[in-house]
Amino acid sequence: MKTSEIMASLQAKYPGEKEYLQAVQEVLESVEEVYNQHPEFEKAKIVERMVEPDRIFTFRVTWVDDKGEVQTNTGYRVQFNSAIGPYKGGLRFHRAVTPSMLKFLGFEQTFKNALTTLPMGGAKGGPDSDPLGKSDDEIMRFCQAFMLELWQCIGPDQDIPAGDVGVGGREIGYLYGMYKKLAREYNTGVLTGKGATWGGSILRPEATGYGALYFTQNLLHKAGKDIKGCKVVVSGFGNVAWGACKKATELGAKVVAISGPDGVCEIPDGITKEMIDYMLVMRASNRNMVEDMAEAFPDKAHFIAGKKSWSVKCDIALPCAFQNELSLEDAKELKANGCWCCCEVSNMGCQPDAIHFFQHNGVYFAPGKAVNAGGVATSGLEMTQNASHISWSGKEVDEKLHFIMDSIHEACVKYGTQPDGTIDYVKGANIAGFMKVATAMLEQGTI
């Protein structure tokens, strides 16, 4: 297998799908050497099959807004790979959603889910619309219209969606309510991220952020460092950033900045519990403005319009917002501001040249598919609880999450340790996930 040849073919076939092509290239470059040591993979054309989704559903979403006007959006569900389990991946409600974005996310999800060691395949979906600016009634009607089409291609043993950007507990509730009515059955295993009183898992909202900090803590311990006292900067203020801030503070780190589309909120003395709680209020407001934090806590926070968290002096950077949010220029600014560790919490949050800069300039770097796997891992634990008709305590879920993140870190170290003793976490994560999926595909035949 030659990465250059496969990429040339994909670029000719999908010329405008930048995110998808970027994700595929990163994985293929990491696994090429190992792949070529397995002629059985080449004979079965594993890579050529793995880079194409099993299927993509595209459908119209028609709903009525509060003014009585009919609105039309496009919805998608990309079922990428089910070699190791039923399709599993979130629903992203965002106006920038495209097939390319969802293919990239579904491809990444395939390897992320494999890293958890839980039996879950990869998928992703969503519409080209988001909750911002919509009333609660409009969000409910939109979710119902979306599920009116989606329900035909999901199921507890087939495809289990969850939340993602723009989809939290409220949206999952509306989606499940419509699914229940259409399917005429009460089967909570069809969605994860549900409310704790009706089949959801305790700690699911915090899980991605918590898991990211457990992985970061493992990385630092491996490097002979301690997270206590470290200054941390975070991008975003949604569920992922909230969970990351909460766990970072609990572990003794000091979160000194969070950011939004409007700018950065500096918190010199570190974020407090009250401020972390207020992040949920900010997200629920649908204003999408981090300046609200500075207005609510004027003595503790300072807002700077148009700036990013990367402009603040720190030890550790946690991109928690969106794909490709951290550029080469941002990476250089972080390094100049004292940053020596960057762990992606968003999916593909760093651009390729930013990752290259980190890896060649003394900055520890770990990729999103490993760092943020705690979210889907806890979704997997929710699936287990639903299937077994049991409910675990928060402590039990947290212990299982911590164990899974420890195992993911160990897999990255196993496959990513270089001859000079350094650890390439990108290569380690990609090879570990790839080998599990590739082996399953090989053993299941040419399908």
Report each predicted region and the residues it spans.
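Structured beta-strand/loop patches that form or line metal/cofactor-binding pockets in enzymes
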Residues: E40-E69
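Glycine/serine-rich phosphate-binding loop and adjoining beta1-alpha1 elements at the start
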Residues: H94, N113-K228
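Adenosine-phosphate binding glycine-rich loop
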Residues: K2-A23, L219, K335-I447
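Flexible, glycine/charged-enriched surface loops at secondary-structure junctions
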Residues: L21, Q37-A44, T117, I154-G163, ...
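N-terminal cap/recognition module
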Residues: E69-T110
